[in-house]
């Protein structure tokens, strides 16, 4: 009896062991089949892998692969060393915005540059190229009113800060995201965008060639007419280079607030503004001058030494030089700033070294009627109080506010040379700066106001923000400004394409009939 019971126990234990082994075998088989299944692996890793590739992949390798080029590996170096050394040597200096490093934006080799220029206008060597291209494609895929109803609502933030030619943003423009698109966006996007850049090179472009988003934004500004513009002048769209230069020369006299007009005379501004007019601070005159825009296409240009070789260099707003010397140089003679820089505490206008040891020229949009009382009581951004405070603290530094009449006269010239109605908003800082330097210099070289082969939707070389409005305009009549500047260009087409460089004669070298 006892032996029989022992046998049953052994049998039960054996069965349990067999079932356990069978269970483990099945579990092992199931797990191996899951690992070997490519669909399961793709489902688990596709999204993360794609994201990591876009962030970590070598951008030159990715672009070369896309274009079918051979690639070579090279160690990347950071451009932050110079900035760190500067901070160590001068701890009290203001921290500069973190530069987009050489690692993030490697300089393209000639082979890549040649292939890229043949392919289109992508930003070769930029880690964010894919982002920019996708945003552009989304924009240009909006070609049907019916499709627009299926998209997210676009938000345009009022005005852009500073469209100086790759530099605009008085409030950011949020692009709408298309929920549709062709299977191959290149078929639509690349030819159209490339034709726009070529149109700028030729000086022949119209609003109808822009993306639907930018067209809608421009029409909104036309309808809004915030500044009460009522242009009654003649339009001469086909004027020659000489005719345009002579027309601008007649209006070129730089005018700044001198404190003699009300309400400024009543406030004692004659004792606040500089005694020496802006037009006379560089007597007997400057030979060659550089206007350096803040456009993202300044990256990889290697134009720093050429820019610094000029007698004077004009820059805009918060554009830094530390960390970007190879591309933009480090000399600054004049800095044009819009009223936001003075009014917004985040720019640290009274303390930042960006605004020291240079000539400052500020401006703010005023009513087209030139009502100075209305402007003083209701400026776009209050620049008057910060200006007075700065002048009292640093009375020896040349600091001027452009007169609204000077700004709107420039706008009148732009409108007079276009049959289309342009945006009824002041010209961009870029256009103002170019005309200012044409009044002060014998020859003016402008960099990346009209885009080169490096054209990208990266708005500023020192910020990671993308929008086609920075190049083509929304708030400012930037598109029409650029066509007018190109009409006056006496430089070569090769320099325009390779360097984004426009050469303009100073007004003292322009000879006009009486």
Swiss-Prot record:
Q: Write out the transmembrane intervals.
A: 11-31
Q: How does it sit in the membrane?
A: Single-pass type II membrane protein
Q: Indicate which residues are glycosylated according to the record.
A: 330, 350, 357
Q: What is its main location?
A: Golgi
Q: Which Cys-Cys disulphide bridges does the record give? A: 246-512, 289-441, 459-470
One Gene Ontology MF term: beta-galactoside alpha-2,6-sialyltransferase activity
List the ranges whose topology is Cytoplasmic: 1-10
Which residue ranges have biased composition labelled Low complexity?
70-92
Pfam entry (one): Glyco_transf_29
What is a single cellular component term in the Gene Ontology annotation? Golgi cisterna membrane
The EC class name is transferase
Keyword field:
Disulfide bond, Glycoprotein, Glycosyltransferase, Golgi apparatus, Membrane, Signal-anchor, Transferase, Transmembrane, Transmembrane helix
Question: Mind listing the GO biological process terms from this record?
Answer: protein glycosylation; sialylation
Q: Which Gene3D superfamilies match?
A: Glycosyl transferase family 29
Lumenal compartment ranges equal 32-514
What is the annotated role of this protein in its UniProt record? Transfers sialic acid from the donor of substrate CMP-sialic acid to galactose containing acceptor substrates.
Q: What's the protein called, per UniProt? A: Beta-galactoside alpha-2,6-sialyltransferase 2
Classification of source organism:
Eukaryota, Metazoa, Chordata, Craniata, Vertebrata
């Amino acid at each position: 009896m006892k032996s029989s019971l022992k046998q049953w126990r052994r049998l039960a234990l054996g069965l349990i062991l067999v079932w356990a082994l069978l269970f483990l075998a099945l579990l092992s088989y199931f797990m191996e089949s899951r690992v070997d299944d490519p669909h399961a692996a793709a489902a688990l890793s596709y999204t993360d892998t794609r994201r990591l590739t876009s962030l970590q992949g070598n951008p030159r390798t990715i672009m070369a692969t896309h274009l079918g080029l051979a690639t070579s590996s090279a160690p990347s170096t950071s451009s932050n060393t110079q900035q760190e050394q500067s901070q160590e040597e001068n701890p009290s200096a203001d921290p500069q915005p973190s530069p987009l490093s050489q690692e993030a934006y490697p300089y393209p080799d000639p082979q890549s540059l040649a292939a890229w220029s043949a392919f289109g206008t992508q930003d070769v060597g930029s880690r964010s190229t894919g982002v920019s291209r996708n945003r552009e494609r989304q924009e240009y895929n909006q070609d049907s009113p019916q499709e627009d109803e299926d998209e997210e609502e676009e938000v345009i933030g009022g005005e852009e800060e500073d469209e100086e030619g790759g530099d605009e943003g008085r409030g950011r423009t949020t692009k709408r995201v298309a929920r549709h698109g062709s299977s191959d966006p290149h078929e639509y996007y690349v030819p159209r965008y490339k034709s726009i850049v070529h149109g700028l090179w030729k000086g022949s472009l119209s609003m109808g060639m822009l993306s639907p988003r930018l067209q809608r934004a421009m029409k909104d500004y036309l309808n809004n007419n915030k500044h009460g513009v009522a242009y009654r002048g003649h339009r001469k769209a086909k004027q020659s280079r000489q005719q345009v230069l002579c027309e601008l020369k007649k209006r070129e006299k730089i005018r700044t607030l001198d404190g003699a007009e009300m309400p400024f005379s009543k406030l004692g501004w004659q004792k606040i503004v500089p005694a020496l007019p802006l037009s006379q601070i560089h007597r007997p005159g400057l030979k060659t001058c550089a206007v350096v825009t803040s456009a993202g296409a300044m990256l990889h240009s290697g134009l720093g030494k050429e820019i610094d070789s000029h007698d004077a260099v004009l820059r805009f707003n918060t554009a830094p030089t530390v960390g970007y010397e190879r591309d933009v140089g480090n000399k600054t003679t004049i800095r044009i700033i819009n009223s936001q820089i003075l009014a917004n505490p985040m720019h640290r206008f009274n303390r930042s070294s960006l605004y020291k040891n240079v000539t400052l020229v500020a401006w703010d949009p005023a009513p087209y009627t030139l009502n100075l009382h209305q402007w003083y009581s209701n400026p776009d951004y209050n620049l008057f109080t910060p200006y007075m405070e700065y002048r009292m603290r640093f009375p020896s530094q040349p600091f001027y506010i452009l007169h609204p009449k000077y700004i709107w006269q420039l706008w009148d010239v732009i409108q007079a040379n276009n049959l289309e109605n342009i945006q009824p908003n002041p010209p961009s800082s870029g256009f103002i700066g170019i005309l200012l330097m044409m009044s002060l210099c014998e020859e003016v070289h402008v960099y990346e106001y009209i885009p080169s082969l490096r054209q990208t939707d990266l708005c500023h070389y020192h910020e990671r923000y993308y929008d086609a409005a920075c190049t083509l305009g929304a708030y400012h009549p930037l598109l029409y400004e650029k066509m007018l500047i190109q009409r006056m260009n006496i430089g070569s087409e090769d320099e325009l394409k390779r360097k984004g460089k426009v050469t303009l004669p100073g007004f003292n070298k322009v000879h006009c009939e009486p």
